[in-house]
Amino acid sequence: MSRIGKQPIDIPAGVTITVGESEITVAGPKGQLIVPVQPQTTTKVEENQVIVTRSDDEPKSRAWHGLQRALINNAVIGVTKGFEKKLEINGVGFRLSGGGQEIEMALGFSHPVKYRAPEGVQLTTNKMEITVSGIDKQKVGQVAAEIRSLKKPEPYKGKGIKYVDEVLIRKAGKAGKK
């Protein structure tokens, strides 16, 4: 049995959850998110909790059960607290400017690299750090991954864009002649 799917989701004050035929709407102080209903699952709102159940005990149903519960939980957290990921830029001559929806970076290429975030995601810059924030966990993670992919950290000196809490595996340089 799915251990995650069996746990009820507590609804905080100020959050309303509406269960529809094909989607679940979660509205809160930071905004509104729509979660699609997964097959073979049913969602009920009872008192101050959301309970997700499944129709049978097939392996696929168990997987959908846990996924549905996790998606609803992420939506509830998103509309109350929000999500954020922090990235840092390391490298000589690497610069960062802008904020809001668009940032411009000098990453050692012959041209400045511009990145425009999708709607619902905010970018803030602080010296050599980028903070990606928003209410949709999937969008925030996707934007952070796209920014990181512009200049992945290299293993010798660690130059590039990396997550703040990421641990890089470094390599030793060439030994050379003696």
Which residues make up each language-model segment?
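N-terminal intrinsically disordered, cationic/polar leader segments
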Residues: 2-145, 149-178
